[in-house]
């Protein structure tokens, strides 16, 4: 009996003469290349999340091509302007926590892909009147990724918002609220991940 999985022939144990040594599977090189491309795109999305959560501008810039555009809430335009807008948020001392879930990658050309990434974000920082505000946001990064010189980055991003909920922000400082739960997350270069990476 032969099992067919997306065009690949997998021999079951009963089809083999002699001892069972595992599946006989040949994966075309183009399939392996596609898997590597998908993983590179996911890494880029994770790099973006580190960039915004750790106020790490090197990681953030590394997620976009220099000529990219971003439609991102109140900002829409060239990605350089988005970086400046994000820098202002970083300087305000805002706390960001981004988590990504479903990532659907659809290749539309040899070196281009449309990528839909679901996200949840907790954003806490000063409002216009300097009062502390906190939001839970759910949405999707709807991206066009391009591969250049073997690297995948965002070329066009549209952030779609599916849910926004303002929460009551705790007024107590983080140290007593977190108690013994240390170390606290921090900005670049003070977060613990940079110790492990040797990037201090």
Task: Please state what every model-predicted region is.
Residues 98-100, 136-141:
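Short, surface-exposed coil-to-beta transition loops
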Residues 12, 20-22, 114, 138-171:
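Short beta-strand edge/turn micro-motifs at domain boundaries
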Residues 1-11:
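Extreme N-terminal basic, low-complexity initiation segments
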Residues 12-50, 54, 58-63:
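Short, low-complexity N-terminal intrinsically disordered segments enriched in polar/charged residues
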Residues 57-125:
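A solvent-exposed, acidic/Ser-Thr-rich amphipathic alpha-helical stretch
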Residues 167-200:
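Acidic/histidine-enriched, glycine/proline-rich intrinsically disordered or flexible terminal extensions
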Residues 127-135, 171-172:
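Short, surface-exposed loop/helix-turn segments at secondary-structure junctions
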Residues 122-131, 164-165:
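Short, cysteine-centered beta-strand-loop-beta hairpins and adjacent loop/turn segments enriched
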